[in-house]
Amino acid sequence: MADANSADALTVKSNVSPAFSIYYLLMVHDHMMYFGDKALVKRHLPAIDGILGFFDRNLSEQGLVGKSGGPIMRHRYWSFIDGAGVWDSGVPAATGKGSGSVTMESLLYLYGLQKAAELAEFAGRTDTAAEYRQRAGALSDAIRTYCFE
């Protein structure tokens, strides 16, 4: 079996990284900014709603993104942040300690909510845009409260 830090680790087992889904949302936003393609945005909004719903369902009591995964091959979801050699398969050591909340995942979710609000507004879904902005505000408050001294 492949080591979790080896080059072929990704091919050994199913690997789902919720954080990568935020990058998909950001690509749709980039497309909107460059091309103004409302039809494409409308086509992708249901998937974006689902992505943001996953993160919303995984908020901790503090309002941060709670532990939804960990290192690849040992958890259902892969909490990949960066390929730093000192981290176990791209996951910060802090993920396994305390609350398990990963500040970077909360920050990614916040950025995703902000950009999804712009997408929803662009597509004429003003109620959804307002909801995403409200969720972003609550998450931003939680990040300021719990992630910084």
Language-model-derived ranges and their functions:
Residues M1-A4, Y34-L107, A120-E149:
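Active-site acid/base region of carbohydrate-active enzymes
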Residues P18-D30, V102-A117:
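Well-ordered alpha-helical segments within folded domains of soluble proteins
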Residues V12-K13:
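Conserved, well-structured interaction surfaces
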Residues N5-S6, S21:
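Membrane-interface coil-to-helix junctions
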